[in-house]
């Protein structure tokens, strides 16, 4: 039995059942649609299809990070009982939540000098990639590692976690300032599906402009083959997430499972959560796996 509590955030885009089964408490982000604030509660109060249908109909969600007070409230029961906490945050290259978490951890340390301590790690990850890193951390913890040992493993390996994604709908990327209006118009006209990644600083980085979804799916699989250490003999885990385009995710999964038959289990396909989905909109497919280190 581990002697610490492993926690993370709703932006990790895994199911409620997954987090419960791995004993990982989750703190939730928030989003706002038409002046109404909602909790990013892992689709407990709304379905993914309903959420993305609102965006497709013109809704423009605004997101907000977890506040210092919410972190305090989330961790205080553990700290007050003398339990140490290891917390993983959404990438600092995407959100300012890492800074808020660090402030809250210090405030609890001041309030409970004899209580448990909270150690905060910037995951430099997002969506189900963040969730895959949390799963790896739980595996290390459940293998008997201490908090310090688990934290050291995460810090050493978090840049081995790859994120690759493409989108067939550039509307939300345009609204969020990820691409220019000209790029969106040209991209839509030419059926361009930009291939993007999360770089070594945890920020979003466009890599290739690919014409047609079919080619984007093929290129995504080739990119994975180029970054996993054992190529077709890769035996690690692979996860996909999507925003209201499961058939596209299934096409990627089928191709990768054909190319990499030694994968650890079938590829898990998740829904992109409401926080990340507020920025991607519908039409995004994302691939996550452990490979060589991200260097740019």
Q: Each predicted region: which residue ranges?
A:
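Mixed-charge interfacial surface used for oligomerization/domain docking
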Residues: 3-5, 11-30, 97, 101-106, ...
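N-terminal glycine-rich anion-binding loop in soluble enzyme alpha/beta folds
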Residues: 5-70
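Positions that flank functional sites
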Residues: 34, 93, 202
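A short glycine/small-residue-enriched secondary-structure motif
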Residues: 45-52, 75, 80, 107
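Glycine-rich phosphate- or other oxyanion-binding loops that anchor nucleotides, phosphorylated ligands
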Residues: 56-92, 99-103, 147, 151
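Short beta-strand->loop
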Residues: 89-91, 121-124
């Amino acid at each position: 039995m581990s002697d610490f509590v492993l926690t993370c955030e709703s932006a990790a885009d895994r199911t409620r059942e997954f987090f419960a089964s791995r004993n990982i408490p989750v703190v939730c982000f928030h989003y706002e649609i038409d002046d109404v604030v909602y909790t990013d509660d892992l689709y407990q109060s709304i379905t993914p299809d309903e959420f993305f249908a609102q965006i497709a109909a013109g809704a423009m969600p605004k997101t907000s990070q977890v506040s210092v007070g919410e972190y305090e409230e989330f961790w205080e029961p553990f700290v007050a009982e003398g339990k140490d906490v290891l917390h993983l945050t959404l990438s600092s290259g995407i959100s300012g939540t890492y800074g808020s978490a660090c402030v809250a951890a210090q405030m609890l340390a001041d309030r409970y000098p004899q209580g448990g301590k909270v150690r905060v790690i910037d995951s430099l990850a997002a969506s189900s990639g963040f969730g895959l890193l949390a799963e790896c951390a739980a595996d290390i913890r459940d293998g008997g590692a201490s908090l310090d040992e688990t934290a050291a493993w995460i810090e050493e390996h978090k840049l081995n976690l790859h994120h690759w994604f493409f989108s067939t709908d550039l509307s939300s990327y345009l609204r969020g300032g990820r691409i220019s209006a000209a790029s969106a118009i040209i991209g839509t006209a030419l059926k361009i599906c930009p291939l993007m990644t999360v770089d070594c600083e945890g920020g979003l980085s466009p890599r290739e402009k690919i014409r047609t979804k079919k080619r984007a799916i093929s290129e995504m699989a080739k990119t994975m083959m180029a970054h996993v250490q054992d190529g077709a003999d890769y035996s690690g885990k692979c996860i996909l997430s999507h925003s209201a385009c499961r058939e596209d995710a299934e096409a990627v999964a089928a191709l990768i499972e054909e190319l990499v038959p030694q994968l650890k289990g079938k590829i898990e396909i998740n829904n992109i959560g409401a926080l990340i989905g507020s920025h991607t909109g519908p039409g995004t497919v994302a691939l996550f796996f452990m490979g060589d280190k991200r260097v740019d």
